[in-house]
Amino acid sequence: LGLSLDTNKFLIKKLLQQHGVPVPNYQLFNTPGDYLNPSLRFPLISKLNAIHGSVEITADAVSETEKHLRERLRYLIRTYRQPVLVEEFIVGREITAILLEGMNKKVYLAEKVFAHPEGKYVYLTFEDQWLSPGESAFRYVRYDDPLLKEYVKKAFEVTNMYDYGKFDVRLDQSGRYFFIDTNCNPAFGPKELDVALSVILDLYGVSFYEILKRLILNTVRDAIGKERLPLPGDRESEADDEALVDVEPAF
């Protein structure tokens, strides 16, 4: 279910909202001429509903007027032939959260420190994320807040994710969190490939090797959990249980 939800940002926003996870005010547009909910407050940011990876998140993604928003919607819907999610742009800091399962659910938080924070609207564009070398656009620093960790765990559960997930969160000037992106299948690889998951966990001393061990442990536990319950004297099932214990590292 988690993967099927991953290509519908609107549905994920609705699920999070219904379960008490804070999100910006939002609206889904199927056509450029759809009625604009008057409760939405500018500035507004437009995102493709079914595509991740910051595709079309450009310097022109934020609209201050309805005229500009309609032009943006017309371009995105006609080019990509899919609905567009429009939400209130949250001015403030941005935190990325990674949840990794092992023996339990562990949340790792990191703030994005932008190299050029002087702009009117500071956010990560497609170019920043994929075309800028190293830390020229931003870098991660450790961040901690028990409240945000609880929100992340709840978001992970209500969207039915498994193994790992990535969440982007904005923190406004009043100290309120808003979940702006949820991804159950983010880029995966070692930190040398500049992958957020590994870069952030490396800040906490968790290597890519350790990440792989935890994921393998999850897979083994899931596989054994789906087998029939062991019968008394069933040596094959007992051997499977012993094998599971043998592969469990101390996290």
Briefly describe each language-model feature range.
Residues L44, E101, K112-F114, N183-P186:
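Short beta-strand elements
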Residues V23-P24, Q82-V84, K105-Y108, Y162-D163, ...:
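Short, structured loop/turn "capping" segments at alpha-beta junctions
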Residues N49-I51, L131, N185-A187:
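Short connector loops/turns at beta-strand edges and beta->alpha or beta->beta junctions
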Residues L3-L85, V91-G92, K149:
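Active-site nucleotide/adenylate-binding loops and adjacent lid/helix of ATP-dependent enzymes
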